[in-house]
Each structure stands twice: as structure tokens, then as C-alpha cells.
A protein has these predicted regions:
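Short, conserved phosphate-binding/catalytic loop or strand-edge motifs used
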Residues: 262-268
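A short core secondary-structure module
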Residues: 321-376
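A short, Trp-centered hydrophobic/proline-enriched beta-strand micro-motif
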Residues: 290-298
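Long, acidic (Asp/Glu-rich), low-complexity accessory segments flanking structured domains
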Residues: 395-417
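Active-site-adjacent elements of ketosynthase-type condensing enzymes
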Residues: 302-311, 370-376
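Alpha-helical interface subdomain recognition
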Residues: 2-253, 257, 262, 274-275, ...
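Flexible, small-/acidic-enriched active-site or ligand-binding loops
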Residues: 367-399
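Short Gly/Pro-enriched turn/cap motifs at secondary-structure boundaries
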Residues: 302-305, 330-333, 348-350, 383-391
């Protein structure tokens, strides 16, 4: 609908640029050139004696991390173009999709030229990466100049939000580009989240309660825990793209519910990639059916992201079993799970990743009265701002026993490598969770902006409010396409650690921005605990921290780019 006396016909015809796909396609080489020049400049900064130096990357962290963000923008725009071209070929590139695509290019081209926000307090500019204005020579083309001047206009944003209002309650704003089977899966889990999760999520959060076991049982019946486990082991053998869709829609309902399958995904990936035949036959069917629930036990109090320096010890006894001694922290869903994927040091003569081994450590599920009944194991809850529903714990091990047969792969010293093999899937899934949280923020904020009236009209009729909603929708679609691309690569057997890292990096920032802007739209009410957006803000904050903090993620991406 038109707002504030605007004429609908005029707004529709003026908002979308002529020959849009031709314009955006022509802009891609200019961005690619800037990225290539930045990579060359940063590589020169961090090279010593003909080799890229880790110490110099650390010393030039702003430049290196800026390169990671620039590469992420470059890949994001490429995937938006791929998405748009595919929709156009199928006759599905409608007005909403055109506006999403157009605004995305207009905004991201400006940010590449003027500064990319790594977060709300850090903007990285081309000068930080050793480039001058001459690096932007390709940005002087008519196509790029047209997009920068006109693509992200107030008229475009206003028209986009008008279309969003017309489609209020739709599964998403804009076509996903996925096939019909995946959209059927999406619809199934969207309905479930609307019926069983959304009405209860805020109470679970405010009361800091565990997600009811009935929800876990229902999700198990729907196949959530065996989604990507091969059929021969009792799973559904579906794609990582299906995992994205399920994670996205459940996290849209509540991030805690969307994260229930994360540890099962990690455990299954570990066992499929590194387990013995006996371990696969024993554990995978139980994981797929949720007969057992796993938890990931990696992080230690003084190591954080530096997993290679873990100190928890695993000592092999004469009977071939192991005893675990040490401390772990930030262990999600630790109390009521049945098995821990536990990383510990089996070689005391090492101080890096080479002495680490992975165990499938069995435990007895706890109760509220006795959360950790297994001998040799203690734990205490860590109270947290958000990401509730499974609870976080510190764990202590003192002579905790693990059967020798539960050493993953039956070989010591392989634990870190085995864990690394799960990072692609874990980061893709986390990116999907971030999209779900961002979409939740948009859903809540848009409804509030429509319902809340100030100065005689709905908030959504004010350009700065509608502009926030428009940019939420645009960036959600950008993050979505980057995430789906990384899932596609994974499904087709291609290395995708770079793209998965980019998807997680961008998705986390998009989720936080959506939650923050969603709360801003609520004004003072957003600061009240009774309003759902307050929960979403707390939940969104974790996405830039876990599964690789944003700084670590950018560091990893930079190392891959620089070689």
C-alpha cells in the first residue's frame, strides 16, 4: 500500500531500475577487482621471507579481517546475482525479489567503497587494507554509479515494505530459490514452530526453563536428529540444505529449539567421518532416533577458541579404558544428555593439537535434583542472558571413566583433525540459525510497527521505521543465499570451509542488527522483559560468539584467502 500520500503507480515504476539484472551483473567485476587488489596488498603486508606469517597477520589484524569481510561481500553479491538470474529464468523474479536484489547491491556497493561495518563499532575501509582511491576505478562505470546513486533509495525501501505488508504472515519475504521439496520441509517446520514453539518460547526464556522433553520427542518423530544421517544408519539421508531449512524455521520460533539438533549433527559428523564401523553401527541409529542425546564437550576455562592448547587429560589404564581429569566450560545441554563428544589430551608430552583425542564418553542423564549423577563428574550451571532452554554448564572431571572402545576411530592423537572435519557443517547450521533469529526479529518488529500508532499513524508509515524493516529483509536474503550456497557446496562434495565461515560471519551480524533495530522500533517497550523482542536481542548476541567468535572467524577466513 502507498504511504503518506504517495501515488502507487509512480512509486512502483520509479522504485525499480531499468535493466536491473544487467546493471548488477556488470557491477560484479568491479567488486572482484577491489577484492583481488586488497588481497594482494594485505598479502604483501603479512609476508616475510617469501611466506605468509601468522604473526604478521595478527599484527595487521584490521587489514586481514577487513579482507575477510570484503571477500564475504564479494561472495554475497555473487550469490545474490546467481539467485536473481535463476529466478528470472524461471519467471519468478517478481517485484519484491527485484527490490531485495536492487537494494542489496546499492547498499553493499556503497559499503565496499566507503567502509564495511565489521560490527557496530568497527568499520574497515580500503585504506586499512593498503589501498588508495585508485582501487575504485571500476566503480566509475555507469552501471556501478547508477546502482550506488539510485538502487537503495527511500522509494525502493518504502515500496518493498508496502509489498511486505501485503504479504504479512507469509513464510518469507521473497522467493528462497530452493526446490519444492525443501519448501515443503520448510512449511512443515514453520507450522510446527508456530503451533508448538512460538506460543511458549518467551515463557521458557523468562523462567529459564529447559525445553520440555515432549518437544524433543516430537522433533525426534519428525526426524530432526537424524536428518542428515545416512539411511543405512536409521537417518533420513537428507541434504545440508534441508538441515538449513529446518534449523532456520525452528530457530525462527526459538533459537533453543533450533539448536537442539546441533549437537546431534556434530556427533554424527564426527562418527561418520572418523568413527570405526562398529562405532557407526552402534551410535548413529541411536542418535538418529534421539534414543540418546549428545553434548559437545570441547571448550576449557582458559582456552576459549584456542582448542589446540586444551589441558584436560585422558590417561589409558592397564585394562584399556581411560580416566578423564580436567575442567570444561560452556557446555550446552550437558545435564540431561547421554553421551559427550569429549576432546582431551592423551599425549602429555604435547602442548598443541597433535596430542588430542576424541571420545564418545557415556554418562547418565541427570535430573533437576541431581544433574550429574555419573561418578567422576560434577557440574554447575552458568546463568546466561539468552540462548536458554538447554542451559550452560561448567564441568569437572576427576577420574571419570571412558571405555577404550569409545575412543573415536580407535586411534589416539586424531581428535583435533576429527573435530575440524565438522566445522563446515557446524558453521552452515549456525548461519541458518542466525537467519532464523533475524527473521524472528523482523516478524516481531513488523507486527509491532503495524499495530503501534504514534502521531496519528502506524509506526510503519514513518520512513526510518520502514527503512529499518526493509534493510532487515534485504540482509536476511543476502545471508540466506550465502548460507544456501555453502550448503550446496557441502552437498556436492566440495570444500566449503571458506564459504561456510563467511555465511556464519555475515549471518551473525545480520541477526544482531535485526534484533537491535527491532528493539529500537519498539522504543521503550522493547526494553521491557514482557516484550518478545527483548528475548530475541539476548538470543541474537550469542551468534557472534559461539561456533567461532566473529574475530576468530575473520582470522580463519583471512588465513585461507592469503594462503
Amino acid at each position: 500500500m502507498a504511504h503518506d500520500g504517495q501515488d502507487m503507480t509512480q512509486m512502483t515504476t520509479s522504485a525499480i531500475l531499468p535493466e536491473l539484472l544487467t546493471l548488477t551483473r556488470a557491477a560484479l567485476p568491479a567488486v572482484e577487482t577491489v577484492f583481488e587488489r586488497a588481497r594482494d596488498a594485505v598479502r604483501e603486508m603479512v609476508t616475510e621471507d617469501g611466506r605468509v606469517s601468522g604473526a604478521l597477520i595478527e599484527a595487521n589484524q584490521t587489514a586481514a579481517h577487513g579482507l575477510a569481510w570484503l571477500a564475504t561481500y564479494n561472495q554475497s553479491l555473487q550469490q545474490m546475482q546467481r539467485w536473481a538470474d535463476a529466478l528470472a529464468a524461471d519467471g519468478k523474479f517478481g517485484e519484491m525479489e527485484q527490490l531485495l536484489h536492487q537494494i542489496a547491491f546499492g547498499e553493499y556497493l556503497h559499503q565496499v567503497a566507503g567502509g564495511i561495518p565489521m560490527n557496530q563499532g568497527e568499520v574497515v575501509r580500503l585504506q586499512d587494507m593498503g589501498l588508495g582511491w585508485d582501487a575504485l576505478s571500476g566503480f566509475q562505470s555507469t552501471e556501478v554509479q547508477t546502482l550506488m546513486a539510485q538502487a537503495n533509495s527511500q522509494a525502493a525501501r518504502t515500496r518493498l515494505v508496502a509489498l511486505m505488508e501485503d504479504q504479512a504472515g507469509a513464510t518469507m519475504f521473497g522467493a528462497s530459490g530452493l526446490d519444492e521439496e525443501l519448501e515443503m520441509i520448510r512449511d512443515q517446520f514453520r507450522r510446527y514452530a508456530q503451533e508448538k514453539v512460538e506460543p511458549n518460547a518467551h515463557d521458557w526464556h523468562l523462567k529459564d526453563e529447559l525445553i520440555p522433553i515432549e518437544i524433543i520427542e516430537e522433533l525426534a518423530e519428525m526426524g530432526v536428529f537424524g536428518l542428515t544421517i545416512p539411511e543405512e544408519f536409521g537417518g533420513f539421508g537428507l541434504s545440508k540444505a534441508s538441515m538449513c531449512v529446518v534449523s532456520e524455521e525452528l530457530s525462527r520460533g526459538y533459537i533453543g529449539v533450533g539448536s537442539l539438533g546441533t549437537r546431534s549433527e556434530i556427533a554424527a559428523e564426527l562418527i561418520i567421518a572418523g568413527g570405526t564401523d562398529e562405532q557407526k553401527a552402534n551410535w548413529l541409529p541411536k542418535l538418529a532416533s534421539a534414543e540418546i542425546l549428545p553434548t559437545a564437550v570441547f571448550t576449557e576455562p582458559n582456552t576459549g577458541s584456542d582448542l589446540g592448547s586444551l589441558r584436560t587429560r585422558a590417561v589409558k589404564n592397564a585394562d584399556g579404558d581411560y580416566e578423564i581429569t580436567g575442567n570444561k566450560t560452556w557446555i550446552t545441554h550437558a545435564a540431561r544428555t547421554h553421551v559427550m563428544t569429549l576432546l582431551a589430551r592423551t599425549n602429555p608430552d604435547t602442548t598443541d593439537h597433535r596430542g588430542l583425542s576424541m571420545f564418545l564418553a557415556e554418562k547418565t542423564p541427570g535430573t533437576d535434583e541431581n544433574p550429574f549423577p555419573t561418578p567422576g563428574m560434577t557440574g554447575g550451571e552458568i546463568e546466561v542472558l539468552g540462548y536458554r532452554g538447554m542451559k550452560e554448564y561448567e564441568l569437572g572431571f576427576d577420574g571419570f571413566k571412558v571405555k577404550g572402545e569409545n575412543l573415536l576411530g580407535g586411534e589416539e592423537g586424531k581428535g583435533f583433525k576429527q573435530l575440524m572435519e565438522t566445522f563446515e557443517s557446524a558453521r552452515i547450521q549456525t548461519a541458518a540459525r542466525a537467519i532464523g533469529v533475524a527473521q524472528c526479529a523482523l516478524d516481531i518488529a513488523m507486527q509491532y510497527a503495524q499495530d503501534r500508532k504514534q502521531f496519528g499513524k502506524s509506526l510503519i508509515n514513518f520512513p526510518r521505521v520502514s527503512g529499518k524493516l526493509a534493510m532487515m529483509a534485504v540482509e536476511i536474503m543476502i545471508a540466506r543465499q550465502l548460507t544456501y550456497f555453502s550448503a550446496w557446496e557441502k552437498d556436492h562434495g566440495q570444500r566449503c570451509d571458506l564459504e561456510a565461515g563467511m555465511a556464519k560471519l555475515l549471518g551473525a551480524r545480520v541477526a544482531w542488527a535485526a534484533a537491535d533495530n527491532g528493539l529500537q522500533i519498539h522504543g521503550g517497550n522493547g526494553f521491557a522483559l514482557e516484550y518478545k523482542i527483548s528475548r530475541v536481542l539476548c538470543d541474537a548476541r550469542i551468534l557472534n560468539i559461539f561456533e567461532g567468535a566473529a574475530e576468530i572467524q575473520a582470522q580463519v577466513i583471512a588465513r585461507r584467502l592469503l594462503g
